[in-house]
């Protein structure tokens, strides 16, 4: 089976629409083959991909060095360059992550429900692949393998569009993946990386490529996600912001609250599951507010608060209205005192992003109300918001976090990259 040449004349094609249409058609054909591939064959393909990534490490690192050099010359931030940079250890980790996906249970062909109708019809609901998943990402080249492997495990084909910063590295990784698929007897076109930096290619992907793309997953900053959500003609699995709250309610143990707050905010400040707002119930503010604020400040976190929070510590600066709706992705948190559970829920509804919100309390009735009434993809009771992660949920890995209401919500793992069909078994029944 031929391996897709990602450095072919496609990259020089004058007609971008023709280029993208061809990618879409090949992905649709490959997706049909992947949908019928046995679980064992898919797993062999993923293990072959992991081995090929290891074999191709020198080539991947050479291309990565070119990307990093260009990023440095362009004056990109150290944070972006760190996300972009690979070394031997990171390449090995990419290969290992693909192998872990191979070890997950097959999400395809599972019987989700079965029932018999009074007329004798036997009806079952069975999980099936989505088809073709378009993944648009920015500077993290590991997304090429992570997202591609999850799509393949779920019996899908993937069209990957890397950001210009990571294009060379992503191309090398995608080439290794296509070679691994071909060695396992699977279609190399099940993984295709768009071979152009032209941003118009993103717009074409968002149209669905004439019905060839079934869902789009953006992995990147706010501007990318906003564009995808505004322009996409196909379903999108994404979240715009991660404005996550920690609500320290009446009945909260102070030691637990301190530990969970610091972990939710400071374990990693730059991820979407990091807490951005602290809400302290007025019933426990006298005993809990000051030590919690001090713990944040002493850990290196700046605090922007309401009048009550400012009164608790002179180092607290005044919060603006915008602070309650800001995803800092940094060692900054907004904090305020709320008058009870209803006020906390109302604040989250007005200012949150429906991502992940936590309540800390030993009051099981209050916790039950919070978990039921807060309209977020993930709600936690006495647990850190940073558990908002597919790996922590036991999904093995995730392609992203979705906060929409249709199909996938929360961590999007292999199970969420499937849909279902109904199989109806009869014995000659006709409808009266």
Curated annotation (Swiss-Prot):
Its EC number is 1.2.1.41. SUPFAM superfamilies: ALDH-like. It catalyses: L-glutamate 5-semialdehyde + phosphate + NADP(+) = L-glutamyl 5-phosphate + NADPH + H(+). The keyword NADP applies. Pathway: Amino-acid biosynthesis; L-proline biosynthesis; L-glutamate 5-semialdehyde from L-glutamate: step 2/2. InterPro entries: Ald_DH/histidinol_DH, Ald_DH_C, Ald_DH_N, Aldehyde_DH_dom, G-glutamylP_reductase_CS, Glu-5-SA_DH, GPR_dom. One of its GO terms (biological process) is L-proline biosynthetic process. The keyword Oxidoreductase applies. Pfam families: Aldedh. Belongs to the gamma-glutamyl phosphate reductase family. This is Gamma-glutamyl phosphate reductase. It comes from Methylorubrum extorquens (strain CM4 / NCIMB 13688).
């Amino acid at each position: 089976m031929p391996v897709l040449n990602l450095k072919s004349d496609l990259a020089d094609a004058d007609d971008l629409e023709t280029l993208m249409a061809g990618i879409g058609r090949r992905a649709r054909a490959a997706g049909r083959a992947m949908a019928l591939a046995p679980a064992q064959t898919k797993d062999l393909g993923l293990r072959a991909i992991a081995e090929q990534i290891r074999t191709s490490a020198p080539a991947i690192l050479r291309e990565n060095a070119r990307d990093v050099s260009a990023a440095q010359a362009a004056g990109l931030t150290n944070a972006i360059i760190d996300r972009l940079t690979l070394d031997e250890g990171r390449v090995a980790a990419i290969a290992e992550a693909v192998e872990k996906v191979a070890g997950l249970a097959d999400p395809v062909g599972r019987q989700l429900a079965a029932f018999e109708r009074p007329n004798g019809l036997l009806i079952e609901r069975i999980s099936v692949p989505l088809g073709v998943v378009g993944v648009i990402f920015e500077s993290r080249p590991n997304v090429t393998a992570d997202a591609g492997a999850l799509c393949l495990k779920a019996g899908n084909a993937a069209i990957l569009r890397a950001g210009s910063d990571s294009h060379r590295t992503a191309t090398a990784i995608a080439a290794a993946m296509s070679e691994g698929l071909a060695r396992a007897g699977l279609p190399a076109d099940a993984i295709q990386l768009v071979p152009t930096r032209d941003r118009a290619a993103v717009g074409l992907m968002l149209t669905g490529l004439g019905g060839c793309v079934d869902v789009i997953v953006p992995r990147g900053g706010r501007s990318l996600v906003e564009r995808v959500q505004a322009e996409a003609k196909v379903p999108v699995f994404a979240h715009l912001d991660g404005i996550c709250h920690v609500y320290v309610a009446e009945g909260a143990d102070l030691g637990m609250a301190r530990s969970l707050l610091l972990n939710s905010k400071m374990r990693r400040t730059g991820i979407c599951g990091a807490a951005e707002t602290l809400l302290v119930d007025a019933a426990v503010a006298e005993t809990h507010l000051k030590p919690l604020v001090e713990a944040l400040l002493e850990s290196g976190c700046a605090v922007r608060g309401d009048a009550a929070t400012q009164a608790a510590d002179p180092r607290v600066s005044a919060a603006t209205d915008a602070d309650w709706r800001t995803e800092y992705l940094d060692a900054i948190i907004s904090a305020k005192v709320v008058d009870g559970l209803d006020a906390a829920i109302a604040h989250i509804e007005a200012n949150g992003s429906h991502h992940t919100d936590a309540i800390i309390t030993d009051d099981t009735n209050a916790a039950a109300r919070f978990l039921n009434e807060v309209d977020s993809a993930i709600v936690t009771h006495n647990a850190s918001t940073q558990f908002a992660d597919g790996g922590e949920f036991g999904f093995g890995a995730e392609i992203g976090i979705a906060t929409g209401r249709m199909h996938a919500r929360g961590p999007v793992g292999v199970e969420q990259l499937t849909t279902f069909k109904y199989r109806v078994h009869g014995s000659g029944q006709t409808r009266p």
